[in-house]
C-alpha cells in the first residue's frame, strides 16, 4: 500500500528530495528498519496524513515564538540543499541568512541571503544576527553551541537522533551520550528539552536559556 502511494509522492516530490533521496526512500518503504526511520520516511508518512513536513512544523513553531520577540535578523546553520526552513521564515518577513556547504541554488527571495560555506565557531561572527536556529545540523551542532555560547547569542536547535563526532574527534556511543556531552559543553548556557512538532515523533531540542 505504501509503495503505491509513493508513486504519487515521487511524481509531485512535495519535499524537494534529490533523485538519490527518492531512491533511498523507495528502498526504505520496501524494506523498512523496525528500529530506525529516516527523516524522509517520516516526512512521507506525514504527507500521507495531510500533515506539514518536519521543516514546516519546525518553522511554524519558530515563527510563533519569534512573533513574541524583538528578533528580526535570523541565521540558520545547516539549511541543507534547498534551505526550506530559511525560505519559510524569510517569506514571513524576517531577514534570514542561511549557511551550508551543500546549498544548491540561490533563491529569489529579497530578504534571504545564502552563504555556501562551512560554519566554524572559531571564525564566524554572529554580531549581525539577533537569533540562531538550526534543524538537525549534524556535524555543525557543536559549532553552533560553542559559537553562541562564546558570543552570547540566543539559539534554538533540534538535534539529530544519532550521535555525531565531537570536535575532538571522539565518537559518542549513543545519542544520549551525545546530548549529555553537548549539555556539559554548554557550561549552563543551554538546556535540553523535548518537543512533539508532529503526532508521529518527538524531537530533542538544545536551546539557550535566553531567547525563547
PLM segments and residue spans:
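A short SAM/SAH-binding and catalytic strip from SAM-dependent methyltransferases
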Residues: 130-145, 161
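S-adenosyl-L-methionine
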Residues: 2-71, 75, 81-87, 91
Amino acid at each position: 500500500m505504501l509503495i503505491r502511494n509513493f508513486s504519487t509522492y515521487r511524481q509531485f516530490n512535495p519535499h524537494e528530495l534529490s533523485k538519490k533521496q527518492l531512491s533511498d526512500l523507495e528502498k526504505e518503504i520496501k524494506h523498512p528498519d523496525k528500529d530506525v526511520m529516516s527523516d524522509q520516511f517520516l516526512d512521507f508518512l506525514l504527507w500521507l496524513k495531510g500533515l506539514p513536513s518536519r521543516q514546516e512544523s519546525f518553522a511554524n513553531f519558530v515563527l510563533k515564538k519569534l512573533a513574541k520577540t524583538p528578533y528580526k535578523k535570523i541565521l540558520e546553520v545547516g539549511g541543507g540543499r534547498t534551505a526550506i526552513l530559511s525560505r519559510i521564515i524569510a517569506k514571513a518577513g524576517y531577514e534570514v541568512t542561511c549557511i551550508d556547504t551543500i546549498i544548491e541554488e540561490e533563491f529569489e527571495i529579497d530578504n534571504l541571503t545564502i552563504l555556501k560555506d562551512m560554519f566554524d565557531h572559531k571564525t564566524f561572527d554572529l554580531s549581525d544576527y539577533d537569533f540562531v536556529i538550526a534543524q538537525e545540523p549534524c556535524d555543525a551542532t557543536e559549532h553552533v553551541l560553542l559559537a553562541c555560547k562564546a558570543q552570547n547569542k540566543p539559539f534554538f536547535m533540534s538535534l539529530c537522533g544519532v550521535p555525531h563526532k565531537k570536535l575532538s574527534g571522539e565518537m559518542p556511543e549513543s545519542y544520549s551520550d551525545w546530548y549529555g556531552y553537548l549539555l556539559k559543553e554548554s557550561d549552563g548556557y543551554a538546556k535540553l528539552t523535548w518537543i512533539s512538532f508532529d503526532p508521529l515523533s518527538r524531537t530533542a531540542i538544545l536551546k539557550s536559556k535566553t531567547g525563547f
